[in-house]
């Protein structure tokens, strides 16, 4: 999900089946990618960019979709952190509203909330399995607590604890309707149909080891066994490739 109006995204997605399905798929292991307006919308509090920058409304907090509350992380995200579209005349950093108005917005946040500032052409990969965050792209990510910045350049890593007290839900389906959960599980099962079973991976590794020993009889026998189980092993310049038989 990407560009548009953050507040429009919040209004359209809040309480919808689509949003529940996204949350459910994430709980089941899917990777979610958000950018621009969408990444603002998923925070605990959203920045009403168009209302401030285009319409001229006063700075205010707008409750967001709060995706990270599922994981006990009170986060808001601001992209276009280092934007310079306004040149020397207008400060368009901090997602076009400028530093002065951003400070006003930041000071409205409740105590204990963290804001993630994303420079342009830069992303933050949050890996909940490893407990690490990695800065990708060309610039940096800024973390703000009580509006005090900590900057992480591209290529750097930091623990997810920097974002808050990360906790998995006690039950994966907590807070999600039965309908959405069942639909998400069905979709995940379909996705997994193409996954290579662990047994095939093990046999392919044994075959590769046999080839390295130049034990061609064993290697051919393992290939035949893999084929008999409905899979094919192909030797490519990048290594072995296991594919399901058509």
What spans do the regions from the language model cover?
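C-terminal and late-domain segments of enzyme folds
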Residues: 47-48, 52-188
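Residue-level detector of anion-binding/catalytic polar loops
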Residues: 31, 114, 232
């Amino acid at each position: 999900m990407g560009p548009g109006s953050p507040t429009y995204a919040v209004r359209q997605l809040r309480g919808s089946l689509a949003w529940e399905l996204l949350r459910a798929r994430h709980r089941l292991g899917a990777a979610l990618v958000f950018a621009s307006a969408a990444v603002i919308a998923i925070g605990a509090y959203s920045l009403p960019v168009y209302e401030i920058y285009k319409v001229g409304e006063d700075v205010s907090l707008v409750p967001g979709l709060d995706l990270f509350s599922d994981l006990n992380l009170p986060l808001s995200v601001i992209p276009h952190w280092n934007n310079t579209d306004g040149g020397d005349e207008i400060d368009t950093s901090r997602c076009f509203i400028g530093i002065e108005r951003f400070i006003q917005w930041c000071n409205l946040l409740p105590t204990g909330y963290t804001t993630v500032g994303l420079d342009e052409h830069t992303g933050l990969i949050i890996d909940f399995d490893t407990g690490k965050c990695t800065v990708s792209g060309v610039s940096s990510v800024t973390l703000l607590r009580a509006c005090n910045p900590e900057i992480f350049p591209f290529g750097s890593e930091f623990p997810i604890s920097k974002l808050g007290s990360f906790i998995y839900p006690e039950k994966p389906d907590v807070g999600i309707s039965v309908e959405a959960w069942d639909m998400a599980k069905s979709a995940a099962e379909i996705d997994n149909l193409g996954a290579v079973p662990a047994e095939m991976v093990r046999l392919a590794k044994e075959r590769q080891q046999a080839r390295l020993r130049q034990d061609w009889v064993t290697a051919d026998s393992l290939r035949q066994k893999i084929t008999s189980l409905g899979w094919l092993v192909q030797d490519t310049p990048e290594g072995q490739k296991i594919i399901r038989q058509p």
